[in-house]
């Protein structure tokens, strides 16, 4: 079965040389996937025969050669870098002979996303070029990888964009719908008739395609549609931990409404009621993949709130603030149904960045 991956390209050497984006650029221009964990510094710092080790490094043909060196001379033992090299040279190419079912991989460069497939000509090499070794520190490579620009974050599914925020240098994207949407985009932008596939129109798949920002916007546009609440733009600060922004009601501009939204792998998606007790206004909490707890102690005890939305109601009161303002949990399923309705009903105001994903949901 094919898989979809993503590549983080900043290596320790490239960061030290202040060449953070150069590894990604090198990958794109040279049609390779390149990783760090070269043996150069380990050989230099070794008390053993440096020339002997260097000769062995020059003869690396596959991962087993690389692994033999780091085991024999106790390089990188127990470190995660070795696993990244194994993924590159073994796991990533395991489907390369399966035409139209090859593994796909994403790369990010200067805010743009690139997509490639691993083909039958892709081979692992240990590149000893001096610039690669000394400046980029990215000698572990997979060759013959053709990168194609898909676009910026506005056209990239949330399950793809959020996968770049943390994790290993090279890792699978396991989020639901990630593989299928990658295959669909490859088919749309790169190779017509490459692979025909569909994604089930379900709330799980829909939210998997939304970025965290799209999810915030979706909840806001529901409130605008339902209650005509208006957001105060200056309250949407990235350093605000407890809410996304503040809204005002047209019925009473003195009353504030706060929302908090958690979606995707980019952040911790659990919410804690204790964080909202001091807010002086109504609070609406939405978490797609997480749970809501009274506090962090309750999470340690695995005592999440049991929230039941009767008749698929949009929200449910779960607590109050210190000033007796209501705190609500928002029903993701009901919000998804609203988004589906907005896709068909053009009288409902909704940004295209959200609606576009229904084109791929069948």
Enumerate the predicted regions with their spans.
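Mixed-charge (Asp/Glu-Lys/Arg
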Residues: 2-101, 106-241, 246-362
């Amino acid at each position: 079965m094919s898989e979809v991956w993503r590549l983080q390209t900043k290596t320790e050497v490239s960061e030290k040389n202040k060449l953070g984006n150069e590894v990604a650029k090198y990958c794109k221009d040279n049609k390779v996937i390149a990783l760090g964990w070269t043996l150069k510094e380990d050989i230099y710092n070794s008390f053993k025969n440096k020339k002997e080790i260097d000769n062995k490094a020059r003869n690396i043909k596959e991962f087993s050669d690389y692994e033999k060196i780091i085991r024999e001379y106790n390089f990188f033992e127990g470190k995660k870098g070795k696993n990244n090299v194994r993924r590159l040279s073994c796991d990533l190419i395991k489907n390369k002979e399966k035409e139209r079912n090859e593994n796909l991989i994403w790369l990010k460069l200067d805010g743009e996303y690139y997509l490639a497939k691993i083909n039958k000509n892709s081979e692992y090499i240990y590149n000893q070029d001096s610039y690669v070794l000394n400046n980029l520190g990215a000698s572990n490579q997979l060759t013959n990888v053709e990168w194609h620009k898909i676009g910026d974050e506005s056209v990239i599914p949330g399950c793809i964009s959020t996968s770049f925020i943390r994790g290993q240098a090279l890792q699978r994207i396991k989020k639901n719908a990630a593989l299928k949407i990658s295959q669909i985009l490859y088919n749309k932008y790169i190779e017509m008739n490459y692979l025909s596939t569909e994604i089930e129109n379900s709330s799980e798949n829909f939210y998997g395609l939304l970025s965290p920002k799209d999810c915030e916007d979706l909840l806001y546009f529901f409130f605008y549609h339902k209650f005509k609440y208006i957001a105060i733009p200056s309250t949407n600060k990235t350093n605000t931990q407890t809410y996304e922004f503040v809204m005002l009601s047209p019925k009473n501009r003195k009353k504030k409404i706060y929302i908090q939204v958690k979606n995707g792998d980019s952040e911790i998606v659990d919410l804690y009621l204790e964080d909202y007790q001091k807010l002086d206004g109504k609070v609406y909490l939405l978490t797609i993949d997480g749970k809501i707890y009274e506090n962090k102690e309750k999470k340690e005890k695995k005592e999440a709130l049991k929230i039941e939305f009767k008749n698929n109601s949009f929200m449910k009161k779960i607590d109050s603030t210190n000033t007796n303002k209501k705190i609500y949990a928002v029903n993701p399923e009901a919000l998804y149904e609203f988004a589906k309705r907005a896709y068909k009903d053009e009288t409902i105001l909704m940004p295209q960045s959200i609606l576009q994903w229904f084109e791929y949901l069948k």
